[in-house]
Amino acid sequence: MEKLATPFFYLNKKETKHSDWVEPFTTFVSRIYGNSVDVEDQIKAFNTLRENAADVDDTVAGKDILYSYYGQLDYLSFRFPTGGNGINISFEWSDILDPDADFVKQSSLAFEKASVLFNLVSLLSRMAANHASAYTVDDYKAAANCLQCASGIAKLLRESFIHAPGRDLDSNFLLGIYNLFLGQAQECVLGHMSFSASDSNMNYSLAAKIASSAATLYDSCVHAFESMEPACNPNFIRLASAKKAALEGFSSYFMARAQLEKSKQGLAIGYLQQAKSILSSAQKLFNGIKLSTDFIHKPSLSDYPQTISTFIKSSLSHLLKTAEKDNDFVFHDLVVKEVELPKISPLQALPPLPLEKLYGSQDGFETAKKIVGDDLFKAFVPSAVTTASSLYSEETAKVFRAEQAEVERQNTQMATVFASLDLSRLQEITHSDSKTNFIPKELIEARSQLISFNPTFKIHELFAKSTKLKQIIAKIKSDLEVEANENAKMKAKLGPSWTLSDSLEFAAPYQSELNNYLKTLAEASATDSAISQQYALVKDDVETLCNSSKISALLESSISSTDNSGQSLLDIPIEQEEQERDMKIQLDLLEELQSRVQKLVPERQTTLQALQQKCLQDDISESLMQNSKRKDSALDTNQLFELELKKFDPLRNRLHASYRQQQLLLNEMRNVTQKLKQNPEFLRKMEVYNNQFSKNKELCSNLLSSSLTAKAISEGVSKGLEYYKTVEQRLAEINKTLGEQLLLRRKQGATCLSKLSSSSSSHTSISSNMRNLHI
C-alpha cells in the first residue's frame, strides 16, 4: 500500500555561463565612490559565491549555497543599480523547456534573482523525488517539506517576476509546477499515513479527501500546461494527467474502505468499481510515458505501471469480490452506480511554504540569516534609505522634545503648587503658640548667609591687605633709591669713564606704576574705612542675627502676651485636643505627600535620559530595506514610522504614569491643605501667628534691612579683596623683574670697571671702587 505513490516529477536546473562580477563592480564603485573605498575582498567573495551557486549538488549544502547567493543578491538590489548607469554586467541562463535554444541574456538583476530561485525550486524537487523513492516515514516528511517550499517559491516567482524572459519562467508554467509540487506534497502525506497506521486503524475517509485534493491540484496543473503558448512539453501534460487519474482512483479506493467500515456495502462496491476503472486508465497513461524522459524519477516510472496492475488484480479486485459476496449473502445493499456516487470533497493537508520558511517556522528566520551571512556591502547605504532614516530621526527627536517639554511643565507645575501651599509656613503657623519660639523664615535665610560670610573678619582682612601692599611698594622704592645712590657715587668718582645708564631713566617706569598703585591704594583705603564705618552701624543687628538665642530673647516679650501654653494639659478642652491631633495628622500627611511627589522628579529624569539614548541609538535602516522587499505588502513611510515609534511606548507610558500620579498626589495635597485651613485649632494658631508677625514686624524689618546692608558690604569686601589680590600679584611681578634688572646693571658696572683696570695704573684705586659695588 505504501509504495503506491506515483512517480515524482522534478525540474532540471537552469545552466548559466560565467559572469564576472569583479571588473564591472570595481569600475562602478571607483566611478561613483572614488578609489578611497576598498571593497575588493567583498567583491571577490560575492563573485566566488555566484560561481559556487552555478554548480551545486542535490544536497542541503547545495540548497544553502543557492539561498546564500540569492540573499546577497537581494541585499545588493537595494544598494546598487545594474545595467548601463550601474554595474555593467549581464547574465546568461538556459531555458529548460528549450534546451537547444541560445542562452537568454539580460543585464537585469531581477532576471538573475529569478533564475537562482528557479534553480532552488528545481533542487528542492530533485531532493523530494530522491526522498520519496526511499519509502520511509522520515523520507516522506523530508520530501513533503521540500515540495511545500518548492511550490511556495514557484508562487513567489510567478507573482514577483511577471515579465521574466524564457518559457520556463512563463506564468502558466510556474502555475503548473506550483500545483504539481503541492499535489506531490499531498501524496507524501498519504505515504506517511500508510506507514503510520495499519489497515485496521487507518483513517480512510481522510485519506480519500487528501487524495482527492492531490487529484484536483494535478488537474489544475494540466490546465496550466495546456494554456501555455507555444505548447508545453507534452510529456509534462501526460505525467500530470496520469497522476491525476491515479489519485482519483486511490481517492475512490480509500472512500470505499471507509464505507466498508461503516457497513455501507452498496456505496463501497460503487467506489471500488470506480477506482478499478480509473486506475486502469491511469495504468495506460503511465505506460504511454517514455522511460527516456528526464524530469521523472526513472526507477519509480519503470516499475509503476506494474505496481498499479498488481494492485488492481490483487488488492482491489480481491476486496471488490469480497464486498460483493458479503453484500449478496449478508447486507443485500443496493449498489450505487458510478455516476450517482457522491463526490469526494478535497482536503488539502499541506499548504505551500513561503521562502521565509525554507529553514523552518520557529528558528527558521535566524537560521536563514546565518546561511546568508552579513550583507557584504552593508557600508553602502542607499540614498532613499538615508533620506528616510533622516526623516525618521526627526520624528524621534519630536517624540523626545515633546516628552522633555512635558517633563519641564510637570516640574514647573509641581514647584508652583508647592509654593502656593507653602508647607514650611503652615508648620510655622502650627507652632506659633508653642513655648519654643520660632524664627521667621526670612530671618533664617538671612542668618545662614551672614554666618557663611563673617563680615568682621573679612573687614579686618581688608585693612591688613592694604597695609601689606603699601609695605611692598615702599620696599621696591627703597631698592630703586639704593641703586640710584650707588650709580651717582660711581659717576662722581669716575666721570665720563663710567658708562652705566642714568638711574632716573631706568627707574622712571617703575616709579610711575608704583605711584599709581599708591594713589589707588589710598582711594581703596578710604573706601575700606567707609565700609568699616557702615558696618559699625549694623554690627549689633548682624551679631543678633547670627545668634539665635539673641533673636529669641528679642521676640520673647511679644510672644508672652499671646501665649496660652501656660495652660495645664488638664485645662485644654477635649475638642481642642482632638483638633490639635487632626492638625498634626494632616501636617504629617502633607509632608509624606510632598516627599512622594518630589521622588517623581529624579525617576522622571532617569526615564527621560533613557528615552533620549534610545532615540539617539535607534537605526531603522534594516527595517526600511526589509520593508522595500515586501513590494505589494510594503508599508508606506508614515505607517512604518508609526510602527517603529511604538518601541518608545514603554518609556513614554512610564512618563505618562508619572504625570498622572503627580496630579493625584497634588490634588490630594490641595484637599488636605483645605481641610487643615478649615480646622478651628489651625485658625486659632493662625490668629496667634498673625499677632506675633504684626508685633515683630518692625523688629524683623530692621533686622532684614541690616542683613541687606551686610550683604552689600560683603559684596564690596569681596570686590576689595579681589582687587588687592590682583595688585599683590602685579607687585610680585614688578619685584621679580626689578630684581633681575638690578642684578644686570650691577654686572654691567662690574664689566665697566674691569675694562678700566686693564688701562689704568692705579689698580688699587679701582679695586677700592669695585668694592663699593655690592654685587
Curated annotation (Swiss-Prot):
SMART domains: BRO1 (SM01041). It is found in: Cytoplasm; Endosome. GO terms for biological process: protein transport to vacuole involved in ubiquitin-dependent protein catabolic process via the multivesicular body sorting pathway. The keyword Disulfide bond does not apply. It comes from the Eukaryota. The keyword Acetylation does not apply. Residues 574-601 form a coiled coil. Residues 7-414 form the BRO1 domain. GO terms for cellular component: endosome. InterPro entries: ALIX_V_dom (IPR025304), BRO1_dom (IPR004328), BRO1_sf (IPR038499). Keywords: Coiled coil, Cytoplasm, Endosome, Protein transport, Transport. Residues 755-768 have a biased composition (Low complexity). Residues 755-775 are annotated as: Disordered. Belongs to the BRO1 family. Involved in concentration and sorting of cargo proteins of the multivesicular body (MVB) for incorporation into intralumenal vesicles. This is Vacuolar protein-sorting protein bro1. The gene is bro1.
